[in-house]
């Protein structure tokens, strides 16, 4: 142990010396941090390794005989399932799909999970929660599961009741890697959960990977204790003494306890509580929530912090008296607002600041990594201790993942409809609604809810329907070229293509790329100078860098310079002719200067006075890069204008010319 520590210290000293030498040799250009191998990190699979494992797990391609011929054929099945071009090749879109987080159940029939289209032969179904995740307090977990069951009871005769002892129809638990059912999880990301079809034994049981960060989909959920806002949730970011905080802090306290504000402005409202910490309380165990007692003795060894010793599941625990060996009283340590995920620290919190390769880091960093993931050290000096973990991200909505898994527990298989809850890939949806495809599937098994009054008329269509490009005339909400691809927006769906000559692929959920957007947008354009996508919906707009929403958005249209009377934008585009952005609403348009970040004077103007033959109340406008033309869309048709002369050179059908129908 001493030799290893000396070796690491010597290595750290050498790295610091090299860093100092680099600074002396040339301060003009700071060298990027070298990519290193983090202890406990899982090495990423090659594309071929990923494909073989993916097709074996989800499409039944045997590992030992999944040769190139079989692989190609199975790849086409997978590509067809996800609406991808059926190339049979490991192209970029196929690999991207395989790397997305998803349910662990297969996409084709697997008789271990779904023997003979099973269903429950009763409408009263019981469930029991065996274990909890430390990421959320028990009340939030209970509520998420109850709401997930209600998704299905709202549209069927099924009724779900919770029991606290004995064998329930659906047993719910959290676990890591191999957890007792022969279908192991795979660490952070990848497989999120799985469930078995209705039946005896494990039938209906639902398991959730506890290496994932469980949230409600929008970052860590932190319910405070004590203070003057007991039981409320932290508000991140919050403002204290004129500074913004994005996590719990001990700033302003001398006792070291972490706290947060439950409103944005603590300076104004003064509402706060203490963040979960083992010094305040524990979860589960047998100590009824009593806090940890440090130091405590376990098997003759003294511990002054939470530990995973004595456990095979990796959960952090502590004794709640000074001698566990004598009293046998313990509890699990709650996750703090800066608890890490993955790494080699078993969920220990970040320690900020920390030293890495001789440099001090005041916040999470991607230094040293090739994948860009944010991480932190869990001691003050990574170079000496090499203890680390990934920083909390948005996490995975326990409600959405559970609602999907409980669909399997009712007998539903995966859906090819990307708008369905039962689609295999996880996509966070802020305003969730069960799709028509989901409702149709569950009602084929159990019938409609007796609470749904259909009256004497025809049965109504329940839930949103995923549109099909060539089977109906779609009036698009927006069309834009973003990062070189043409995107077509309709309600919560998008289609994408590189050129108008190719049939767009999709649909995909808008939330796949831009999760914070509302279900329906009014307009979209890309600022090519900054490569930012700007979306309009109602009287607000959103600005994204790639898939990251810029801080402070959405903002009102008035902050862009539009008058208060404009409550909706019809279309917008950045014109390559003069690099200005044009915003259309009704019969008027405005011109926005992207460099000066303000509207040009002399606007609005009437569309009819400035644009040749262009109608009012447009649906979308796009200027394709390097094409020399702009395209104005309304209804099922479009008008093509030559940029220099503003002459109309073509009037055509969107369906035939842009959608390949």
UniProtKB/Swiss-Prot annotation:
Residues binding Zn(2+) 2: 179, 181, 194, 207
Post-translational modification: Phosphorylation on multiple sites modulates enzymatic activity. Phosphorylated by PKC in vitro.
Annotated Pfam families: fn2 (PF00040), Hemopexin (PF00045), Peptidase_M10 (PF00413), PG_binding_1 (PF01471)
Name by which UniProt lists this protein: 72 kDa type IV collagenase
Binding-site list for Ca(2+) 2: 169, 201, 203, 205
Keyword flag Cell wall biogenesis/degradation: no
Compartments it resides in: Secreted, Extracellular space, Extracellular matrix; Membrane; Nucleus
Species whose genome carries this gene: Bos taurus
Catalytic residues (UniProt): 405
